[in-house]
């Protein structure tokens, strides 16, 4: 499988802690409902799953934000719940309600029946990865992704999204043996799923631990981080083009556990807006010439509802909080990939995103010229 050579490798260089001319950026959920063109494609597809399972539509919506904004990476258009769906839990999206499963995993029999799914059931995802990579034609790198074992388990046990995580936490505290079994299956499934995305052409992969932050200290380490480690240990290190494939881990609410996360086997840690990039850099960013992790994040997505002048101010505050970027192209050092602290809201005005992108690229260039 061969693809066009990469023209803009700024994002991948930053993942590898190599100096870049400016701070690269992409946005979580950058292909989505805030774009009128996305809504038009979704209407054609008839439903969210109709969109996600159709290679042509998934390719179209992945590229839509890149047609509007000079972003530095594309991310596969899909959903984290495709893996439990392939396990036979029956995923559906009711209009305005969010995801739900026809079958939840709550007792011994449910857990005993769980297995790593046949990856052929997810062929539509891998076909989309290859199609998107071809359509990008080397413009920017393509990121593949999955939910974390813990985050998938939250949906699998609850049967849908939750405000209090009562059912999944009840199972965790009362039958930790069952919880560990679910998480072990999930970890092996996520690793196989991400490896198949890498084989299909993904140039970086990201694990979204969206609900890791709801766990108590101690439980996070045992029930979330431990199984994220299990995923990372199984991931392929080389992509189809012979290049290394950076691994990104994002735990929403995980900034308090950076000491625990600094030694996990990934290249990039994502942070939400509650973390301070400079403090995170001191813990995990490393020194010039030494080991460390790149950081990704972490502006509050709600900043995008403010007027453009305030967006620029907040962008500068985030870039300043990371500190002086490393500029020595002969070695590695602390690097930053600009992103939101969570997914973009569907109500965001697209012109505000344009202001954000322009501010990130412009101000981060000027920081390197001081």
From Swiss-Prot:
CDD domains: URO-D. Keywords: Cytoplasm, Decarboxylase, Lyase, Porphyrin biosynthesis. Its EC number is 4.1.1.37. Signal peptide: none annotated. It catalyses: uroporphyrinogen III + 4 H(+) = coproporphyrinogen III + 4 CO2. Pathway: Porphyrin-containing compound metabolism; protoporphyrin-IX biosynthesis; coproporphyrinogen-III from 5-aminolevulinate: step 4/4. Homodimer. This is Uroporphyrinogen decarboxylase. The gene is hemE.
């Amino acid at each position: 499988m061969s693809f066009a050579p990469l023209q803009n490798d700024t994002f991948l260089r930053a993942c590898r802690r190599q100096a870049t001319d400016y701070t690269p950026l992409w946005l979580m959920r950058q292909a989505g409902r805030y774009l009128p063109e996305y809504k038009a494609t979704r209407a054609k597809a008839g439903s969210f799953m109709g969109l996600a399972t159709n290679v042509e539509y998934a390719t179209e919506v992945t590229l839509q934000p890149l047609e509007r904004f000079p972003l530095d990476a594309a991310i596969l258009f899909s959903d984290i719940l495709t893996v439990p769906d392939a396990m036979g839990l029956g995923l559906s999206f009711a209009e305005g309600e969010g995801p739900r499963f026809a079958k939840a995993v709550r007792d011994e029999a449910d857990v005993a029946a769980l297995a790593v799914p046949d990856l052929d059931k997810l062929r539509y995802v891998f076909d989309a990865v290859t199609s998107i990579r071809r359509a990008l034609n080397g413009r920017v790198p393509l990121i593949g992704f999955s939910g974390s074992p813990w985050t998938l388990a939250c949906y699998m046990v609850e049967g849908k999204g939750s405000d209090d995580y009562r059912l999944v936490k009840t199972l965790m505290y009362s039958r930790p043996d069952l919880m560990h079994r679910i998480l072990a299956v999930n970890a092996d499934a996520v690793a196989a799923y991400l490896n198949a995305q890498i084989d299909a052409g993904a140039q970086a992969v990201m694990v979204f631990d969206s609900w890791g932050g709801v766990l108590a200290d101690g439980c996070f380490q045992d029930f979330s981080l431990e199984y994220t480690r299990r995923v990372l240990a199984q991931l392929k290190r080389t992509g189809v083009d012979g290049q290394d494939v950076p691994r990104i881990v994002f735990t929403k609410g995980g900034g308090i556990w950076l000491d625990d996360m600094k030694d996990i086997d990934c290249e990039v840690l994502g942070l939400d807006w509650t973390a301070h990039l400079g403090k995170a850099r001191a813990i995990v960013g490393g020194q010039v010439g030494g080991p460390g992790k790149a950081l990704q994040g972490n502006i509050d997505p709600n900043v995008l509802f403010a007027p453009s002048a305030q967006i620029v101010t907040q962008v500068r505050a985030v870039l300043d909080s990371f500190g002086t970027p490393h500029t020595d192209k002969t070695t590695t050092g602390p690097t930053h990939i600009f992103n939101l602290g969570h997914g973009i809201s569907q109500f965001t005005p697209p012109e505000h995103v344009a202001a954000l992108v322009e501010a990130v690229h412009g101000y981060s260039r000027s920081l390197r010229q001081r």
